[in-house]
UniProtKB/Swiss-Prot annotation:
One of its GO terms (molecular function) is dCMP kinase activity. It is found in: Cytoplasm. Its main location: cytoplasm. The gene is cmk. Gene3D superfamilies: P-loop containing nucleotide triphosphate hydrolases. Transmembrane segments: none annotated. It catalyses: CMP + ATP = CDP + ADP; dCMP + ATP = dCDP + ADP. The keyword ATP-binding applies. InterPro entries: Cyt_kin_arch (IPR011892), Cytidylate_kinase_dom (IPR011994), P-loop_NTPase (IPR027417). Keywords: ATP-binding, Cytoplasm, Kinase, Nucleotide-binding, Transferase. The keyword Nucleotide-binding applies. This is Cytidylate kinase. ATP binds at residues 7-15. It is an enzyme of class 2 (transferase).
């Protein structure tokens, strides 16, 4: 089973991905973790690294191509990343997670230890605008389009455990139909 989990920053993609991976013994490829690690290695914030990626498209493309290669060579995997649902068209189940900007900013504030919510809001808006522009320029993808996704879940409505139950039900249904 190949699964993709996508969503905007702070929507809960990483939390759900690792929860499901443990439940279903699936390998994980996380574009966001790779992106954050590359930013840290360069001593840049996510917004700064996003701007750097605007200047050097090879970084984004490298992450996306590597994720696709690994996903296609493995049949028991969850690919987590903003574009995973677009890039891994062969996935059995493509999920988009959504949450309000305010909710996502609170999560990002807690996760990334911003000095205040205003700074987290500003950084999140800058990052999202930068990413949307890059995806449109590089791949002609409108990140706001949900067209490739089979399942859209609101992460403000349910806990990660409840979301995992919903997704597990979809996985079981797909496995029965194979």
């Amino acid at each position: 089973m190949r699964i993709t989990i996508s969503g905007l920053p702070g929507s809960g993609t990483t939390s759900l991905t690792y929860h499901l991976a443990e439940m279903h013994r699936l390998d994980v490829i996380s574009a966001g973790e790779v992106f954050r690690q590359m930013a840290r290695e360069r001593g840049l914030t996510l917004a700064e690294f996003g701007s750097f990626c605007e200047e050097d498209p090879s970084v984004d493309k490298l992450i996306d191509e590597r994720q696709r290669e690994i996903a296609l060579s493995n049949t028991h995997i969850i690919a987590e990343g903003r574009l995973s649902g677009w890039m891994i068209q062969e996935a059995d189940l493509k999920i988009w997670l959504k949450a309000s900007l305010e909710c996502r900013v609170r999560r990002i504030f807690d996760r990334d230890q911003f000095s205040d919510l205003t700074a987290a809001m500003q950084a999140t808006k800058e990052r999202e605008a930068c990413e949307a522009l890059r995806y449109q320029q590089y791949y002609d993808i409108d990140i706001g389009s949900l067209s490739p996704y089979h399942l859209v879940l609101d992460t403000e409505m349910w806990t990660v455990e409840q979301l995992a139950i919903i997704v597990s039900s979809a996985i079981q249904t797909l496995q029965k139909s194979e």
